[in-house]
């Protein structure tokens, strides 16, 4: 079971769910597993449009764009966005008042395990270890849905912003 922390809407239409960074794997025992995706597209139409962009090869196109050398400022922003995302996820994970509000009790060893399992996973589950080196050669992308949901939820995701611009042009 995924725990919804907040629902983001526009014009009465559910756009994005903000999720707790762990999900229950058992109803009988308080067992939790990492759920690294904080922002989840909740609108079926938007989800379908982003799926269509992925089928058309946009992930590869955007990887080429961000790695082309022409977008160094965007590249630096993207690196920073991953680390802000990890920080936000960790803050939620350790927020005891939120755990109380959601009526869950995550034991310390479970929090530690979840933190270690997710500490180097950025937006869309991307391994950020190579991003620690500011001169790393190549950035990779996964799941435009995660990037776009993160953009809609925070306005802080360059890949999601590019996806948004493409979707607005297609309307």
Q: What do the PLM-derived regions correspond to, one by one?
A:
Residues 1-171:
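Preference for intrinsically disordered or flexible, low-complexity segments
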């Amino acid at each position: 079971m995924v725990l919804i922390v907040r629902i983001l809407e526009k014009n009465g239409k559910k756009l994005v769910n903000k999720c707790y960074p762990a999900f229950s794997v058992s109803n009988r025992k308080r067992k939790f597993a990492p759920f690294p995706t904080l922002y989840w597209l909740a609108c079926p139409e938007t989800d379908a449009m982003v799926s269509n962009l992925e089928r058309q090869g946009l992930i590869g196109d955007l990887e080429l764009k961000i790695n082309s050398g022409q977008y160094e400022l965007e590249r630096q922003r993207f690196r920073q966005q991953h680390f802000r995302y990890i920080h936000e996820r960790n803050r939620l994970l350790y927020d005891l008042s939120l755990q109380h509000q959601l009526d869950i009790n995550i034991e310390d060893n479970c929090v530690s395990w979840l933190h270690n399992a997710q500490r180097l996973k950025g937006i869309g589950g991307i391994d950020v270890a190579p991003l620690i080196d500011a001169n790393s050669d190549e950035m990779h992308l996964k799941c435009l849905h995660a990037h776009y949901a993160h953009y809609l939820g925070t306005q802080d995701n360059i890949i999601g912003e590019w996806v948004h611009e493409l979707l607005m042009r297609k309307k």
